[in-house]
Amino acid sequence: MKTRFDKAKISGICVSVPEHKICIDDELESVFSNDIKTLKRMKKVIGLNTRYICDENTCVSDLGKHAANTLLQGLNIDKNSLDALIVVTQSPDFFMPSTACYLHQLLNLSSKTVAFDLGQACAGYLYGLFVAHSLIQSGLGKILLICGDTLSKFIHPKNMNLAPIFGDGVSATLIEKTDFNEAFFELGSDGKYFDKLIIPKGAMRIPKADIFNDDSLMQTEEFRQLENLYMDGANIFNMALESELKSFKEILEFSKVDEKDIAFHLFHQSNAYLVDCIKEELKLNDDKVPNFIMEKYANLSACSLPALLCELDTPKEFKASLSAFGAGLSWGSAVLNFKDLYTKDILIYTKEK
């Protein structure tokens, strides 16, 4: 699916991560059972170093509220002027109601501000931006997009294959109506591979072997039960590489934007080696492809792209391509124009005493 919008702009972005910081080197004994070779390999290939993890009482809404309030205050936005609040997450506070409605209360928004969730993972920022642009194209004025996850809650802390890879974080983005600003999107999904990245148990469907195409996800072990995240790492890597390469090429062709005019190519920060492979295959300049979020925050799921935008030193006006791939399977790319983008260094959320 490809589409173009011309009525919306991204005015600002803030990202919040929890205060508990973990360094992978400190987990040599507790997580890696003194397997120094595996630890060093994960650091080198995936790009891991530190990550931030929520405690049991901190959820998406807490980080979202922190990021949203900071953003709205920084932009001097009247909360009553917001037309919609969208929360994109795979780790909601509750099954019912939506996290957006709960956050609506926490932010003390007007009853005229519609609130709803979108269930997307690593490609979720692009899906959220797509929906926000669609709504503004139809006449809305201001949309607050909250995007991110607390996936550490679905991973056993001693699972050395997954625990070091995922960090927690949530972004807040303000999208506003403007006179003219082109934005191009290319999105896709393939449900045949729904079980390649999945939490099999915990919702309404009872997990049974005949439901899944991947037999190995039903094979539990000491540090992975059916309530925990399962990832077919090798296949996910290969499909992410193929999908992001194809999506990137298609969005450039569709937008008719010259690659030389794009300041940054932002790829979902799930694996430093994967980003390097994409960059080399597309023959992109190193300085256009930032690749450092994994080292500082690990895989922030749908929050990794907004985290990149917050951490980059961007000019007053620039074009960027954004690409991501995640559970579903879902993927997407966009070419966006930015002007006077408000950002702050990534925020550390401290629980209120």
Stretch-by-stretch model annotation:
Residues 11-14, 88, 119, 143-149, ...:
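Short beta-strand segments
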Residues 67-83, 245-263, 312-313:
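Phosphate/pyrophosphate-binding loops at sites that engage ATP/ADP/AMP, CoA/4′-phosphopantetheine
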Residues 61, 65, 91-92, 105, ...:
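Claisen-condensing/thiolase-fold acyl-transfer catalytic domains that form or cleave C-C bonds
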Residues 83-91:
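Membrane helical hairpin/interfacial module
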Residues 1-56, 159-238, 337-353:
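Condensing-enzyme catalytic core mediating Claisen C-C bond formation in acyl metabolism
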Residues 35-41, 94-108, 145-151, 216-220, ...:
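Acidic-glycine-rich active-site phosphate/pyrophosphate-binding loop
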Residues 141-170:
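Flexible, glycine-rich active-site loops centered on histidine and acidic residues
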